């Protein structure tokens, strides 16, 4: 089979986005070897390539978390039911999703343990022991862990019973300080997702109906997928003093009086990997942002005659010497696959840059580069690789963000009334709809009941929504979502 035939067959095996986006997504997750199903209900295995993406995301986000003064810790996976029940709104919000441990070995436990759905309860209990004085504040902790939420309908990365995340939990002496923390960490998420994942974000406040169980306020970063649905990329919660009063988290202030602390929590999960797939992917598979790609550039040696093998292989070694220290590089010299097959494998897996090296390239002392985002080709001299390849990766990162931003702009509609919002979604149109919102629960409930769309957030940045501002109203973004 020729390279062209192999490419055609490989591409034909992948469903087009326009035909069935959901099926396309599942096929890409499988073909790109990001994840696979397991015998455990609702739980996936994240394969090495998918976990490699998560490792780079974790490294880049963890750096930002620590730069804002936070430290990492680890709290128990199991949470006593009695602790969860102390905060009524919290337990009511998570009870349908809790998985319970009822036996230890062959003995029935006296008290059930919830497998961690989130950690506010156990952390609140421990903070009540650790915090004594205003000198102990603020407490700024983060943990990287897995959580379990017993989902009825699951989809790899987007909604699974078990997933990986980070959750930050902080305690402060004053409400303004806690509020500052909430907004600071929301900005960390926005900047991280836009800079490293190349995904444009709407940041804003959730409505009361959509806020986290037990929180005073919830803030969110929202992204738009290629099928026109929104995805929540991370949340930051102002917990007020609810958990402090429930778990008796107090401190002695400078005047010697006991005061309740003010708390926050914030988190982001592996569903961001799903967002990368759905924002940047195309009909050939993944298109990974270079900043989080496990392999940023792949070298494909090309030879047809045995006598060319050693020459090409020797030149490939020189390429690795030039750029191996500045990019995450892979050399694919497998004999059992043709160059055409390899091209399509790495297109499917979203490797940002392909470097082709054949006898003609060796003769000209250059490498042919092929971008995954645009398929543009460029011959780069060996001596220039160490500067040009990182520059190309930066261009690809910026290009992916620009394409995603243009798509979001084209699929963000302004509506002047609730009726226009409903009409938009009833016509099966996609994307975000911005509209004046009177702040009532009935407004968003009617939109949700009639269309399935929810109020995603009240955005901070109104630069593109100025025409919608009304006295007594706030601009709100509506969308169908994951």
Q: What does each of the following model-derived ranges do?
A:
Residues 1-482:
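NTP/phosphate- and nucleic-acid-binding module
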